Amino acid sequence: RSGKCPEDCKYCAQSAHNHTDCEVYDFLPEEDIVKACKLNESEGVDRFSIVTAGKALTGEEFEKAVHAYETMNKECDIELCASMGFLNAEQLHRLHEAGVTSYHHNIETSRRNFPNICTTHTYDMKIETLKLVKAEGMWACSGGIIGMGEDWEDRLDMAISLAEVGVDSIPLNALMPIK
């Protein structure tokens, strides 16, 4: 699903608080997701992920995601990843059982700078989610965004936080403001 996220992350085009021309749609049908996975696999892509806007994927949408992953796990030979916000231990376990091997959840910046970019959830919530990912035995992918008013100390603090959690992959993004 895309757009209309209730979170107030200042950098995000998906946030309902930010006025962008972001495409808005609900959770895609399973057949579309599986078709996209197969296409990516046929083109040599190593990993495929369902990425959703919003604080967390819950209820019927979460169940749809689990079923889509089960189908992709049976029909495709590709690493499966997920990026669905704040999930609990049970949800992460279900995704893992469905074939997901990696979970993406960026911390965005340092603990000190985080309140400057988001007030609808906390840095500690992000760290806790990553700890749950690691406890489940999944590959943790987490990084941040450069160019949101942070200084070099914030960048270093973010790196230290990621090392303390033991993340396996650290994507770094550069903010490109939407006009």
Give the location of each predicted region:
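Long, contiguous hydrophobic alpha-helical segments, chiefly transmembrane helices and signal peptides
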Residues: 1, 14, 105, 144-145, ...
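Local cysteine-cluster metal-coordination motifs and their immediate loop/turn environment
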Residues: 3-16
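Generic, ordered loop/turn and secondary-structure boundary motif
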Residues: 6, 115-118, 176
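Short glycine/proline- and charge-enriched loop/turn segments
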Residues: 13-16, 111-112, 178-179
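Conserved Radical SAM active-site core
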Residues: 18-143, 148-162
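Radical SAM enzyme [4Fe-4S]-AdoMet core and its adjacent flexible, acidic
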Residues: 163-179
